[in-house]
């Protein structure tokens, strides 16, 4: 597994270099399911690059990835979950605050995750049997303190409408941040800068963080308190295990019928 982990980090860094080299080119921006659901030429090229690299080394591995129709279940033998550019709107509009995310599973068990903040050259990597790091520095275990001393991150629409009581939770916290990228939000949690992140996500949006956070004391669950299914878009949150009950006291009582 160490060789596979090292290989994954290597190809993710190569993909990041490719993005930085070509991000000023014509991106051929398209809209998928809505006016704000953007995809670029580089989303597709980076995913193809990663898949091709992996298959050249591990020809029997399978994939669940954002672009196209790669939808293998993580419960199969060897499955990579890939989001080639998370935060595509940030990528297009700002040229920063976007990331590559890769997770690797064997028979449903997360082996390692990688979140690579492309413009900051910040690689969050580890999980499973590996200690979680930011580049070469160990990531901190969760340190508890009162809810009112923590920032949280969330979905702007959920906050505005108080869906699931997210606005109520934000009022009990130190404040709320909206980053426009699951990867960037998760990286802030892993660094100890945020308590929790609440939004709607697809499996490729949270797979890497679910593996990275486990050993640091964090968990990803649905807003109805169940394990995520790694198959569909769901309302989810990442939060410290020891804070889940307190957060649930704001969230779950107000869930939509």
Predicted regions and their residues:
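A short, compositionally biased
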Residues: 25, 98, 126-130, 214, ...
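Generic detector of well-ordered alpha-helical packing
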Residues: 44, 67, 84-87, 118, ...
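An extended, acidic
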Residues: 142-257
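Residue-level signal for inorganic ion chemistry
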Residues: 19, 43, 54, 88, ...
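N-terminal subdomain of lithium-sensitive/metallo-dependent phosphomonoesterases centered on the IMPase/IPPase/PAP
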Residues: 1-85
């Amino acid at each position: 597994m160490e060789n596979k982990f090292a290989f994954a980090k290597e190809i993710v860094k190569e993909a990041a270099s490719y993005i930085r080299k070509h991000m000023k080119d014509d991106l051929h921006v398209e809209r998928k399911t809505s006016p704000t659901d953007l995809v670029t030429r580089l989303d597709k090229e980076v995913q193809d690059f990663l898949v091709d690299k992996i298959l050249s080394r591990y020809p029997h591995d399978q994939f669940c990835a954002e672009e196209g129709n790669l939808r293998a279940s993580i419960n199969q033998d060897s499955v990579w979950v890939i989001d080639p550019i998370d935060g595509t709107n940030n990528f297009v509009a700002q040229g920063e605050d976007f990331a590559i995310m890769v997770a690797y599973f064997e028979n449903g068990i997360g082996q390692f995750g990688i979140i690579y903040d492309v413009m900051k050259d910040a690689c969050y990597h580890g999980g499973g049997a590996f200690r979680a790091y930011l580049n070469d520095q160990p990531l901190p275990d969760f340190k508890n303190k009162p809810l009112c001393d923590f920032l949280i991150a969330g979905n702007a629409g959920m906050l505005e409408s108080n869906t699931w009581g997210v606005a109520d939770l934000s009022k009990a916290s130190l404040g709320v941040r909206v980053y426009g990228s699951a990867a960037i939000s998760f990286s802030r949690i892993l660094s100890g800068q945020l308590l929790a992140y609440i939004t709607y996500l697809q499996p490729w949006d949270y797979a890497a963080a679910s593996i990275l956070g486990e050993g640091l004391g964090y968990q990803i669950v649905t807003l109805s308190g169940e394990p995520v299914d790694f198959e569909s878009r769901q309302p989810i949150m990442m939060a410290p295990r020891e804070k889940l009950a307190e957060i649930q006291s704001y969230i779950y009582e107000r869930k939509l019928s």
